[in-house]
Amino acid sequence: MAADLCWLSLLLASLALSGAVYEDQVGKFDWRQEYVGRIKFASLESGLGAKKLIAVTDKNIIAALNSRTGDLLWRHVDKDTSEGTVDALMMIGQDAITVSGGRLLRSWETNIGALNWEAALEPGSFQAVSFAGSQDTARYVAVLKNSALSLYFLSNGHLKWSESLPESDTVQYQLLYSPYKGSVHVVGLVPHSHLTILTFSLEDGSISHQVRVLTPWLRTLHGTCGVIGEGVLVCGDVPMASVHIVSLLSGEETTRYSVQSLDIELAEDPTQLDVITAPQNGIGGSLSQFFLQIAPRRFLLMHYHDGVLTPLRDFSQVSLVNFATTGEKTVVAVMQCKTEGNPKSGAESEYLTGQNCAQEPWYCPGHTYSINLYMADSGRRLLETTMSFTLDQICVRPDSFYLQTFLRKDDSVGYRALVQTEDNQLLFLQQPGKLIWLREESLADVVTMETVDLPLTGAQAELEGEFGKKADGLIGMVLKRLSSQLILLQSWSAHLWKMFCDARKPRSQIRNEINVDTLARDDFNLQKMMVMVTASGKLFGIESSSGSILWKFYLHGVHPGSSFKLLVQRTTAHFPHPPQCTLLVKDKVTEKSAMYVFNPIFGKLSQLAPPPLQRPILQSLLLPIMDNDYAKVLLLLDDQHKVIAFPATKYVLQQLQELHSTIFFYLVDVEKGKLSGLRLNKDLSTEEIWEVLLPADQQRITVVKGKRSNEHVHSQGRVMGDRSVLYKYLNPNLLVLVTESTDTHPERCFIGIYLIDGVTGRIIHSSVQRRARGPVQIIHSENWVVYQYWNSKARRNELTVLELYEGTEQYNSTNFSSLDRPLLPHVLQQSYIFPSAIRAMQATITERGITSRHILIGLPSGAILSLPKALLDPRRPEIPNEYTREENLIPYTPDIQIHAERFINYNQTISRMRGIYTAPSGLESTCLVVAYGLDLYQTRVYPSKQFDVLKDDYDYILISSVLIGLVFATMITKRLAQVKLLNRAWR
């Protein structure tokens, strides 16, 4: 009995110590979307009941997706460097074999994503990997490096043998083939000279056969050559317009087949001769058929057997081709542009502005494609296998596709298709073209974002229209008020009726679909439109409360690595003028700039044409002045230091001429280590007025950061313990310049922090952190700067905070001018030890700036830590006194601890977090937070708790019951008191 009581007490104690998020709070005002990135390799389970899809992406991820729903089953994220790059994927049964960074060979159990085994590879550049075995059974994994061939056991990953390759300094070994007959073949190439074919024995790794074949016409094996049949190497030769075939088993001289001799109609000589072969299957056999690509959109299905090369079928207007096997049947899939019908018009015509892809050779009018299956051995088309689908974006083409084939009961071939488009969209289709699910994988690489308030409803707009129009007169305003109230009453009645109807339905049947037509601002402005720009050049409009994608738009021709800048020129506050956003794109390859103006609510290009940008843009500046349509003026500075204004109306140009002396730019030249300031002239030219030069051979500029334009400062000073006021140095023109040393040695590296006035070029403050290195994460807000760096001496991460004050007397309380500041501010500085690396940092922001500030820190683990700014206060005393206690200053301790209860995303971690975006809401207590990386996460934070709204668990029934009870008690007590007074009077 005593033992039972002891166990019960321990159980109760453990329950008391456990903590979690309440069940009704999970997903109530937050959501997370997980992505994997652009697919490099994919394998779909075959069979009618297959449910799994294995994918390897460019984000160094191996993942499994549910082929029925598109949901993520499991995901493994490797290093975000070249060491984590997945070079190859092979499937055998329920196991996946991958090569990572050319260093690690791994085996995965695909049902649960568990790691079966891992083996370290021999040094050298990775070339190829293949299964190997004997008697048509795979038992080993062969890995080819540029100078060695290694063989590993498939069951446990142990090394069986590793052999060096002869003449590896001159021969480029690139191809690996195993016939599953106790040997493995390695093919090396000396460009424009000869092929070297080596045959290794699987038992001891000895070279059983070596032959050299002259190939003076061959430059590379990749894309040009492939293995078919029983060890037959097929290569294309463009200059000679022929196909060369050599046997890897016998090593005989090449046999040349001219394309002209294959009875193929050619208008001109082929522009390319690429060989596309089917992947080697799990029992060692290879198909005798292959595709020969003779033009960008023309493919030939070829068959080779017993020295005879035969064309089976000629395909034109082809986008993509692929092979698939189910049972004993092997088919080829051909994707072609479906030319029937007219190109799309209507709503899509609004997107055509700035899109010039109609002249591209791959352009498909109507954006409709069809997939057809053909028997690989004969080229015969299979009936009832056509699948048609239409892409929702113009100037987008399919990039790759994979098949999931199965045999029906009547022994016919059925299939589903996974299509990946140029804009990183995944579509999973089934016959005859039904879309099962869709994933937008470009959201795994968000580079910038902004939020826009949702528009008012018709009733709200009608109510807003009452104010500011006195010309209607008293009677007119009263009638307008009555009509607007009737509209509100009508909408309220419709809302009550919908609630009544939904209450009678099961919860599964209640639909709260969100689309652009039903979007409306909520009472507290918590629901916003998130405009996201991805690295692939695709824009998204996402509703913040649910994460639903309402619109998307792809910018064709944007090269990887291009820079983007998103600006909100007009919000929804200026009804009936629509909101307006401007996206600036600077191409990394051509260095040309482009500008797109669009409506962020509907995702349509604006009717206002942006100015043509003939020169590269160096800097942009969004001014607070507006044109007649309430759009903020955007100034663009090109490489000739000329300024372009948008919109360039007469009213705007007049304002610029009046205010030109108060408009300044700054430019950063990283190569020269130069920060310069320019002033605008009346003729929209600029002149340089100051510059700061840093020794570029010793340090390089890494970050230049100003303050957020939408930031509000509620208090201009801090009340100290002696009741005096310490006034903040609130310079809106202040820039923070961060430099890192070019010397990376731990004893000599350093980082520099410079606070520079962007108008005068005056250095307000500078400091150097010795034995420190980046990357530096920084926040610049109000009168303080917080930055993080790595201390090489102490080998730890540190946070440093700077706060700037004018002193106990304010120089000018009504207007700040950088030209009239004779005294430098007082700078307070303090450093802290932080126990983790930091991937992203941002400060909370609210509508009026009254709420306490918190620092949101993204950790490598994917958690987001909400750290009160009070902990990063340089005035924290080491020894508290009565004045510091009066100010509630926390005593100084050098380390900042990470408490799990400060994580705002509990278990909803964000992989590879790149940025945190914060936006104010209509409630002063609430800040909206969006974290992006591989995943997207949106939530709300309350730095000072919810002081301006009732909590969700507020007990309305209890309070109402108490109030009603008090009212009745008051009435009864009053009646009893009257009776008592009457009885007393009669006495």
From Swiss-Prot:
Gene3D superfamilies: YVTN repeat-like/Quinoprotein amine dehydrogenase. GO terms for cellular component: EMC complex; endoplasmic reticulum membrane; membrane. It is a single-pass type I membrane protein. Its main location: endoplasmic reticulum. Pfam families: Beta-prop_EMC1_N (PF25293), EMC1_C (PF07774). GO terms for biological process: protein folding in endoplasmic reticulum; protein insertion into ER membrane by stop-transfer membrane-anchor sequence; tail-anchored membrane protein insertion into ER membrane. Keywords: Disulfide bond, Endoplasmic reticulum, Glycoprotein, Membrane, Signal, Transmembrane, Transmembrane helix. Residues 978-987 are cytoplasmic. Residues 1-21 form the signal peptide. The chain crosses the membrane at residues 957-977. Residues 22-956 are lumenal. It is found in: Endoplasmic reticulum membrane. Glycans are attached at N812, N815, N907. Disulfide bonds join C225-C235, C337-C364. Belongs to the EMC1 family. Component of the ER membrane protein complex (EMC). Part of the endoplasmic reticulum membrane protein complex (EMC) that enables the energy-independent insertion into endoplasmic reticulum membranes of newly synthesized membrane proteins. Preferentially accommodates proteins with transmembrane domains that are weakly hydrophobic or contain destabilizing features such as charged and aromatic residues. Involved in the cotranslational insertion of multi-pass membrane proteins in which stop-transfer membrane-anchor sequences become ER membrane spanning helices. This is ER membrane protein complex subunit 1.
